[in-house]
A protein has these predicted regions:
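A short, N-terminal "cap"/entry segment at the start of jelly-roll beta-barrel domains
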Residues: 1-38, 46-47
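Glyoxalase I/VOC metalloenzyme domain signal
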Residues: 11, 41-43, 112-119
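Catalytic core of non-heme Fe(II) oxygenases with the double-stranded beta-helix
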Residues: 28, 43-58
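Short beta-strand segments
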Residues: 35, 79-81, 106
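Short, conserved beta-strand element in jelly-roll/cupin
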Residues: 39, 55-73
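Short beta-strand segments in beta-sandwich/barrel cores
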Residues: 44-45, 69-74, 97
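Short acidic-glycine-tyrosine-enriched beta hairpin
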Residues: 75-94
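Ligand-binding loop in jelly-roll beta-barrel domains
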Residues: 92-117
Length: 119
């Protein structure tokens, strides 16, 4: 199968999903989805996305590049860590996350974006 070149821009996302204190900009490119999450200070998955997901923890696995801000991630087993700009995280399902500090968090997500915050 031959692929054709594609060039897309998050400023002209194929789909935008908004939720309290955040949004997901989704691109359909190369036969896959890639998302940019922008999360405002005060955002927390268990408060702002849990009602949409209907699960106690985020069940979407993620493979993310962290562009801006600090995101604290807490796994189901209670372990937690902070993800900061320049880092890459691979998260299995079963986690909560929240913005730490006054700077918005921006992440680019290759795995969990297609179903994220989908009502």
């Amino acid at each position: 199968m031959l692929f054709r070149s594609e060039h897309k821009d998050f400023a002209k996302a194929d789909e935008v999903r908004t939720f309290p204190n955040g949004q997901l900009e989704l691109l359909h490119v190369g036969g896959s989805d890639i998302g940019r999450l922008i999360l405002q200070p005060g955002w927390r998955w268990s408060e702002h996305v849990k009602p949409l997901a209907g699960t106690d923890l985020c069940e979407a696995p993620h493979f993310q590049y962290h562009v801006a801000g600090t995101l604290r991630i807490q796994m189901a087993d209670g372990t937690s860590f902070d993800a900061v700009p320049g880092q890459v995280t691979a998260l299995p399902s079963g986690h909560d996350a929240w913005v730490v500090g006054d700077e918005p968090v921006v992440v680019v997500d290759w795995w969990g974006a297609s179903n994220y915050a989908k009502s």
